[in-house]
A protein has these predicted regions:
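Catalytic core segments in nucleotide and nucleic-acid processing enzymes
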Residues: 1-96
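Aromatic-enriched hydrophobic runs in primary sequence
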Residues: 14-15, 19, 37, 121, ...
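Non-catalytic C-terminal interaction segments of nucleic acid-processing enzymes
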Residues: 52-166
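C-terminal engagement modules used by replication, chromatin/transcription, nuclear envelope/ESCRT
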Residues: 160-183
Length: 183
């Protein structure tokens, strides 16, 4: 396949400085292209602090964003944009996000199953913490960590769970609203 021309970094520098002027050095510089970058391109990217990513890796990131609109935190993603080839770093970030989504989906299903089994309309945090321990959790969570995720899932922005707030966080009650599909 084709590779990115060696002079791509120099062209990006020249055009970027012309259009962005004093903002150029603070801006994120990214080259998207096919194949492996040449040795010279990698060296230029390191010197000019330009990240290089394959189109397929970018596509995975875009598909994740399309499927789970709120899942990608741009400030967090920016930490993965290092000078040079960054496909491994971006794939690491995608895997981290997918793991977080699976955990949240598991917790939503836990609430749903708990309410089905108990016949209750909602469940107290303490009961959900115990249920989580016995539900083959994908990762260990402290009670407060589980509570924080329950809060996130009950936010009006996500709307997967509902919440009845009490005077103590351990007494807050949660109920199921909708699934978070994963595949």
């Amino acid at each position: 396949g084709k590779s990115i021309p060696d002079r791509a970094v120099e062209e990006l520098d020249r055009i970027g400085k012309r259009h962005l002027q004093e903002n150029y050095l603070q801006s994120v510089r990214l080259i998207i292209g096919p194949g492996e970058p040449t040795k010279n391109l990698k060296q230029s990217a390191q010197i000019s602090k330009v990240s290089i990513i394959k189109a397929m890796t970018l596509q995975k990131l875009v598909e994740l964003k399309a499927k789970y609109p709120g899942a990608i935190n741009l400030l967090e993603l920016k930490q993965y944009l290092e000078p040079g080839q960054i496909d491994d770093k971006i794939n690491e970030y995608i895997a981290k996000i997918e793991k977080e989504i699976k955990l949240r989906s598991h917790i939503i299903q836990l609430v749903k199953r708990h309410l089905e089994k108990t016949g209750a309309k909602d469940a107290q945090v303490g009961n959900l913490c115990i249920a989580y321990l016995y539900d083959h959790p994908p990762q260990n969570l402290k009670d407060k960590e589980l509570y924080d995720i329950l809060i996130e899932l009950s936010s009006p922005l996500t709307g997967y769970l509902g919440r009845t707030k009490e005077d103590d966080w351990k007494k807050d009650r949660f109920y199921y609203l909708r699934d978070l599909p994963i595949n």
